[in-house]
C-alpha cells in the first residue's frame, strides 16, 4: 500500500467486499500480456444463461464491429427455460448494410465470434437507443421497445 491507495470508504456503515485484501468495487476486468488493465464491465451486469456466465458487454462489443450496425446494446432478459437469455437492441446504419440487417445475420455474426450461450435469442431494431443525460443507455427503457 502506498499513500495514494484507497483503504476504505468514509461511510463507516458501508460493508466492504474484500478479496485477497483488496476492496472489490464490482468492476470486471483482466490484465493482458503487457500488464495493461482492461475493464470489461460490472459484476452485477453478468447474467447466467443455461448455467453459463455471460457478460452482455462482450456481445455488445462484438456487434459494434458488425457492418450495418450504427449502435447496439446487449442485456439479459428473464427466460423460463434458461433463467435468463441475451437480448440485443440494434440501431441499423442508414446505408445498404443497415437496410439488409436481419436478426438472423446478427445471431450468425455473434455465433462466429462467441460461444453459443452468448448468441442473442431476442433481436430488436430501433431508430435510436434510449439514453440518459450523460449518454448512457437506459436498459429499463429498452424492454418496451422494438420487435423481435
Predicted features by range, described:
Residues 1-2, 50, 125:
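A secondary-structure boundary/capping signal
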Residues 8, 18-21, 26-118, 128, ...:
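AMP-binding/adenylate-forming catalytic core of the ANL superfamily
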Residues 51, 135-136:
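Conserved phosphate-binding and hydrolysis motifs of nucleotide-dependent enzymes
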